[in-house]
Swiss-Prot record:
UniProt keywords, alphabetically: ATP-binding, GTPase activation, Kinase, Magnesium, Metal-binding, Nucleotide-binding, Serine/threonine-protein kinase, Transferase
Residues binding ATP, per UniProt: I24, G25, K26, G27, N28, F29, G30, C31, V32, K45
Protein kinase domain segment(s): 18-316
Organism of origin: Dictyostelium discoideum
EC top class, as a word: transferase
UniProt key word Oxidoreductase: no
Comp. bias (Polar residues): 1208-1229, 1246-1257, 1277-1287
Cofactors required: Mg(2+)
Domain DH: 691-927
Biased composition (Low complexity): 451-471, 994-1021, 1031-1044, 1230-1245, 1263-1276
Domain of life: Eukaryota
Protein name: Kinase and exchange factor for Rac A
Record field: compositional bias (Basic residues): 1290-1303
Gene: kxcA
Compositional bias (Gly residues): 1117-1137
Length: 1311
């Protein structure tokens, strides 16, 4: 029975009852099918490799979590099925997309109410899970399914869920971590332990013991504490929820589109980057935005609990619902008003039709009666005239009825007080007649044709507007752009009314006179009347919202000095296009009558600007719109030029002439290119041509091979190690991964782009020289064979493709152009890799001391050897390939620059590429030298386990010595790192190994012997790397054997205990009470230590005294401060002292101090000097022993300093590295040194920041002008960095079980 499943058959499902359909998803652990189980649609998750313990562990957790969870927002669990084809989990099938695909596929951004509902559903789900002490640890948008039918979310994928959270009574058997660490086994309720673990997920105090949790989840949704491998609690789900909220806000993918986190800032987030990625318009609720940022707080204590999150989201949801209800009510009111307006208009139209019919009848009757009555006397002239006028009006009415156009009715009633009488003036446009003082028919006159047509246009526009104004597009435009609305004043001013009355009276009199004139005068009269009718002005008011515009009209640039303004408004006239309806944005001019702070009264003439129109913007008349037509003076020359340009014939002639010239230039260049490669009688040109083609073929073939090797490093080594790190079975931590592989992924991307360029330009005639105009069949055959050698396919036919000369400046047409345009990126990335190379080699050899990593590397190497037997498939060999790549480029382009003719099209590019590659090669060589200088401290920084993340790298600090010590009183093992200004006292801790960690009988005699032998070789001044190479080769042979039981985990970390600042009163001397013992006198404590032999004890004392003397020389007035931080202390070579000559070291002083302190000459000395110095040193050792027993015994630091100062002092020498380097690495470095000596130019050793691939480690070596660490005299000179050896296997009886678990041992030097 699978662990986690109940013994009853309730959760067991038979395989025959399952019906599999199509695949609906894929994940890290298997596929998900859509299926059927006993007539119910289900989702079937297949786990094929169920025998793997990791898969079993996570499957057991998922089953255990789903079996007991019953929540409407969690997928329902039906059961599990075990079969030969794999293990299957059967859950509820959700008809819908996951949240990630939904946000990606939605055509329009979803409403904020729906987004808040999704977030609220997730928060309620996690509030329930945390109340049951269950951590999900994999909250992301892909694990949230949207149930469309029920309009709710469903949470799935409980593979990383932790039942019982980190607080358990021991019943959770799924823990894969070491639970016996004394720092983690503390009762949360009892007060011991970290503050992180005092409460459960629901905020209540925890009562059970603490359990360390593993590292799992999706990196883009993981909080910083998980990525930094620190302790974490329930707040990790809150951080993931905050990332999910930002995804709902931006509708983009975190970790890809924004917030690509790195360890530069401790995996923190950037708020400015979030603000940039929010789509416009940014109408996100402020409370929702603040909640997302608060959940993404860097400190876990600042993140809220899900109970608080649910409360905030419910308040946001309530506000959004109220807002939407108000909008819906406003829309309903607008629709009702529109309907009422339409009904009123329909009634008015019906009334107008009835009136027209009555008038037609009356006109017909009056015409018949007038025709029957003869004209007898003059008294009836007025009536006849009136009848004629009325007949004219009836004719006009008949024409209106035939055209089916109905006029609008607008009535304005005002009272005009006078001294004698009170008259009522009404103005109507009914029946196309202008009536003044409606009680009398004296001034009844028909409208002109122009006025009738204008009224028809207005009426038709209003009718069309009323029929289409209810569309959603119009409402959205009104609500989104309008600043105010225009309201027409019902009561016009007295002056306006008088002006209108007088104008209308004059119009009526003129019309009566003009009717008796000819038809030519009638047209002039219509134009005058229409122009005068346009002079009728209307008054209106525009008011601003005081809350939106507190400064009033000043925000629009309008003040008391402004007389006229431009009014930009949304016209109610609808422009009906062929496909859609578009609102018109129009602009008119208005005169200011009265100006207040938030309101403006103006007069307008535009008839389209009616009451209720939306005002989009208001601007000053002259300031903001200077494009008003003004007279422009044009010179005669300008007029002539315009005439020439506007002449189409001459313009076409110029275009044809230019095209002919461009074509002639291209053909000429092509012929010159052909002539450069014509076969001549001389063998020199033919040999150069063949050599040119052969070099390019060699360059492309080597590029393909190099790219294949980089892919092997990434796919065979890097990706499997990263995948094991993600599934909680790490071979290395993220710092070690970044240290070993550096930025090799960036290098692979650069060469991938280069291969794309090669494939694109491979068909170009300028690249292969396969021309159609070439008549030499033999040359065509040679070119075809050349392409076959490059791409391995003789069937490929290369055609003649001409190069576009217009885009030649922006298009990359050759390999040399790619290198020239991308040389800065190549220089940067290869410089980073070279700076980290030595440091990467140290970390790789240290990590191979772990059997798990060693077996993994050997297994991958054996698999690659079977596939590629002719290549070097070892990881160390593959990592050394990029170091020589630029040197290979340099050799190829140096030869190409010599044999390429000057008239060749690529000659300039090849020449410039050669120059840039040479500069890049020198720069990489300088970075490689600096890597030897700083690699030791960088390696120590990775091996240390310290509380803070402060780096050891500092200007003027270098490595001196390291070694193992045993404390006499407690028999504890310590490890010391002596640097130029500080001393690190550490405690070794064995790394974890899944298969070989239980081997308690660690044989350390061999390691001690190696330590002794290496110490003796140091005194004899032999190559220290040979002994280490022999020991690592033996270790490799043991690791590659079939007997894995003999493997020993020799990889140790170093927990930092104390940092001793050498500026303080510290000293080290021989312990006279015991052999091989030293006394380390610190500022607060005296240590009694034991070393493996007497010679090593003397070496430690001498190196320590020289270091302290050098610090005193550089800082003669500076007493040590009580600063024990890693960055404390500034002494060392090139340190900042008061004397300008402190950084200079005399060679005689170096020799004297070496003789006094029993130390050999540095490695740069010859063998003869070494033998002589050894004989001298043997005599001085006896004298120094006597002096130590007699003279210096009991003397303080100042006396010993004076004794040494009389003979001169110098810095302790930097020793060669004892880290094992593979033969390929050594050979590659030797090749680089030989090439560098040939191409030695003046290069500034400018350090660059080490930017490695993610996960990565960053080091920034300091290169000050005043404080420059001295580089070695030779390019390939190495410094001594010994791999720490295994401590002695002296055991001490422990009183308790927990204290036995604290026993740690250390090793370093076996590969």
């Amino acid at each position: 029975m699978v662990g986690g499943l109940p013994n009853s058959s309730l959760w067991n499902i038979e395989y025959d009852d399952l019906v599999f359909k199509d695949i609906i998803g894929k994940g890290n652990f298997g596929c998900v099918y859509r299926g059927n189980y006993l007539g119910v649609e289900v989702a079937i998750k297949q786990i094929p490799s169920f025998d793997d313990p990791d898969y079993c562990k996570y499957t057991e957790r998922e089953v255990k979590a789903l079996r007991y969870i019953r929540h409407p927002f969690v997928v329902h669990f039906f059961g599990a099925c075990k079969h030969e084809s794999g293990f299957y989990l059967i859950t509820e099938f959700i008809e819908g997309l996951d949240l990630r695909r939904y946000l990606k596929s939605v055509p329009k951004p979803p409403k904020w109410l729906s987004r808040v509902n999704i977030a609220l559903g997730v928060a309620k789900t996690f509030l329930f899970l945390h109340s049951k002490n269950l951590l999900h640890r994999d909250l992301k948008s892909k694990n949230i399914l949207l149930d469309i039918s029920r309009n709710q979310i469903k949470l799935c994928d409980f593979g990383f869920a932790r039942v019982g959270s980190q607080y358990s009574n021991g019943s959770d058997s799924s823990s894969s971590e070491d639970e016996s660490d004394s720092e983690c086994v503390n009762g949360a309720a009892g007060g011991g332990g970290d503050d992180v673990y005092k409460n459960n997920g629901n905020g209540k105090p925890a009562n059970y013991r603490l359990r360390r949790m593993s590292i799992c989840g999706t990196p883009s949704f993981m909080p910083p504490e998980i990525l930094l491998q620190q302790k974490y609690d329930w707040s990790v789900d809150v951080f993931s929820f905050g990332i999910l909220c930002t995804e709902l806000i931006t509708l983009k993918r975190p970790g890809k589109d924004y917030w690509v986190r790195s360890q530069n800032n401790g995996f923190d987030i950037n708020i400015e980057e979030l603000n940039v990625n929010i789509p416009s318009p940014n109408d996100c609720p402020i409370q929702f935005y603040d909640l997302a940022l608060k959940c993404c707080s860097y400190k876990h204590t600042n993140r809220p609990m899900f109970s608080t999150i649910v409360t905030i989201l419910e308040s946001i949801k309530l506000q959004l619902e109220l807002f939407e209800n108000q909008q819906q009510q406003q829309q309903l009111q607008q629709q009702q008003q529109l309907q009422q307006q339409q009904q009123q208009q329909q009634q008015q139209q019906q009334q107008q039709q009835q009136q027209l019919q009555l008038q037609q009848q009356q006109s017909s009757e009056s015409s018949s009666s007038s025709s029957s009555q003869p004209l007898v006397n003059n008294n009836n002239n007025n009536s006849n005239c009136n009848n004629n006028n009325f007949n004219n009006s009836s004719n006009n009415n008949n024409s209106i009825a035939n055209n089916d156009s109905i006029s609008n009715v607008s009535t304005t009633t005002t009272s005009i007080p006078t001294t004698t009488t009170t008259t009522t003036t009404t103005t109507t446009t009914t029946n196309n007649i202008t009536a003044i003082n409606g009680t009398s028919n004296k001034y009844l006159q028909p409208l002109s044709k122009h006025q009738q047509q204008q009224q028809r246009n207005q009426n038709s526009s209003i009718i069309d507007n009323n029929s289409l104004i209810g569309s959603s597009n119009t409402e959205s435009m009104i609500t989104s752009f309008s600043i105010s609305t225009f309201k027409e004043r019902k009561k016009q001013s007295l002056n306006k009314l008088i002006r209108a009355n007088t104008i209308n009276i004059l119009i009526g009199q003129q019309q009566q006179q003009q009717q008796q004139q000819q038809q030519q005068q009638q047209q002039q009269q219509d134009n005058q009347s229409s122009s005068q009718n346009q002079l009728i002005e209307r008054e209106g008011v525009i008011k601003l919202d005081t809350t939106k515009y507190p400064n009033g009209w000043k925000e629009f640039g309008i003040d008391n000095s402004t007389n006229k303004i431009w009014i930009i408004y949304q016209s109610n006239i609808i422009k009906i296009g062929s496909n859609n309806n578009n609102n018109l944005i129009e602009m008119t001019c208005g005169t200011i009558i009265k100006l207040k702070k938030h309101s403006i009264t103006l007069s307008i003439v535009d008839s389209n600007l009616i009451s209720g129109a939306n005002i989009i913007n208001v601007k000053s008349y002259l300031k903001d719109y200077p494009y008003v037509n003004k007279p422009i003076k044009v010179n005669q020359q300008q007029q002539q030029q315009q005439q020439i340009i506007t002449n189409n014939y001459e313009l076409n002639l110029i275009i044809k002439l230019q095209s002919r010239i461009r074509g002639w230039l291209v053909r000429r260049r092509y012929k010159i290119f052909l002539s450069n490669w014509k076969l001549n009688n001389s063998n020199t040109s033919q040999s150069n041509k063949n050599q040119w083609i052969r070099l390019f073929n060699q360059l492309i073939s080597s590029e393909l091979e190099y790219k294949k090797q980089l892919d092997q490093v990434i796919k065979s080594y890097l990706l499997p190690i990263q995948s094991k790190f993600r599934i909680n079975k790490p071979l290395l931590n993220y710092k070690e991964i970044g240290s070993i592989f550096s930025n090799i992924e960036s290098l692979s991307e650069i060469h991938n782009e280069l291969l794309k360029i090669v494939n694109q330009i491979s068909k170009s005639p300028f690249f292969i020289m396969n021309f159609e105009n070439e008549k030499d069949d033999r040359s065509n055959q040679n070119n075809t064979s050349a392409t076959t050698d490059i791409f391995g396919d003789s069937s490929i036919q290369f055609t003649n493709i001409s190069i576009n000369t217009k885009d030649s400046s922006n298009q990359i047409n050759s390999i040399t152009q790619f290198i020239v345009k991308n040389i800065s990126q190549i220089k940067n990335q290869y410089g980073i890799y070279a700076f980290n190379f030595k440091y990467s080699t140290n970390i790789y050899n240290w990590c191979r001391l772990n059997p798990d990593f060693s077996i993994f590397c050997d297994t991958i190497r054996s698999q690659l050897n079977q596939q590629f037997p002719d290549q070097e498939n070892d990881l160390a060999s593959l990592l050394s390939l990029p170091i020589n790549k630029i040197q290979k480029y340099l050799l190829v382009f140096e030869k190409l620059a010599q044999i390429t003719p000057i008239t060749h099209s690529e000659y300039k590019d090849i020449k410039s590429a050669f120059t840039l590659i040479r500069e890049t090669s020198n720069y990489i060589q300088s970075q490689l030298e600096m890597s030897f200088e700083h690699s030791h401290i960088m390696s120590i920084d990775i091996m240390l386990q310290k509380k803070d993340n402060q780096s050891l790298m500092q200007s003027g600090r270098w490595f001196i010595r390291q070694g193992q010590f045993t404390e006499l009183s407690s028999n504890k093992q310590y490890y010391l790192f002596l640097l130029s200004d500080i001393c690190l006292i550490t405690k070794p801790i064995k790394s974890k190994s899944s298969k070989y960690n239980n081997n308690n009988n660690i044989n350390t005699n061999n390691n001690n012997n190696n330590l002794t032998s290496s110490a003796t070789q140091t005194n004899s001044n032999k190559d220290l790397s040979t002994s280490i190479n022999q020991s690592t080769s033996n270790a490799n042979s043991d690791n590659s054997g079939n007997n894995n039981n003999n493997l020993i985990n020799s990889k140790y970390y170093y927990r930092l205990k104390t940092i001793i600042n050498l500026k303080e009163e510290v000293s080290m001397r021989i312990n006279p009470d015991i052999s091989n013992g030293v006394l380390f006198i610190g500022p607060n404590k005296t240590y009694k230590w034991l070393l493996p032999n007497d010679e090593e004890a003397k070496d430690w004392v001498n190196d320590f005294e020289r270091t302290t003397i050098l610090i005193y020389r550089n800082n003669p007035n500076g007493g040590g401060s009580n600063n024990n931080s890693i960055g404390g202390g500034g002494g060392g070579r090139g340190g900042s002292g008061n004397n300008s000559n402190n950084g200079s070291i005399d060679l005689t002083e170096i020799n004297q101090i070496h003789h006094i302190n029993n130390q050999a000459i540095p490695l740069s000395s010859s063998n003869n000097n070494i033998t002589n110095n050894n004989s001298i040193n043997n005599n001085i050792i006896m004298n120094n022993n006597n002096n130590n027993n007699k003279d210096t015994e009991g003397k303080g630091f100042i006396k010993r300093f004076r004794l040494s100062f009389s003979a001169g002092t110098s810095t302790p020498e930097r020793k060669t590295s004892l880290v094992n380097m593979s033969p390929s690495t050594t050979s590659s470095l030797n090749n680089i040194d030989s090439n560098y000596n040939n191409n030695n130019n003046n290069v500034t050793n400018t350090p660059i920041k080490s930017v490695t691939s993610s996960p990565s480690i960053h080091y920034t070596p300091v290169n000050d002008n005043n404080q420059q660490p001295q580089l070695p005299s030779q390019p390939n000179e190495e410094f001594q960095f010994t791999v720490p050896t295994t401590p002695s296997d002296k055991k001490k009886k422990r009183g308790s079980f927990s204290s036995k678990l604290k026993r740690l041992s250390i090793t370093f030097s076996k590969d």
